[in-house]
Amino acid sequence: MAMDDKVLKKREEIQEQDKWSINEIYSNDEVWEKEYKELQEEAPKLKEFEGKLGDGETLIRYFEVNEKVSRKAEKIYVYAHLRCDEDTSNTKYQAMMNKIDAYMAEYATYTAYVVPEILSLPDGTIEKQMEELKGLEPYKFLLENILKEKPHVL
């Protein structure tokens, strides 16, 4: 095996069919930036549900909003990381990756109350709501896993 075979090629030297098609995630960086700004506006709204999760309809709305926002956050995160992985020396994409990484830590603070709040509800509250509200069905597994922790929480 020749020594040249072990030299890492630059991205522009790689054939197009052998590259990730990241533009299917976002057509360009400006679209990414627009969605990032939208995420910064939408994510804090998750805090509006704090103290209200004992109401089943509110819990359903929380899960729906959280799902929408978290999918957007994941898409933004993946795009930035894949762009950075294309060429780790590209400072523009390093900055994008660092930007979303830092924001994801902030994002986590908007939902940090959810599990403790659910666990603090009176026994049987969530179970009763799951029986009465079909809208909680998609979240049954998640809620049951949270409730399994209740005996271990002071």
PLM regions: where:
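A well-structured
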Residues: 1-154
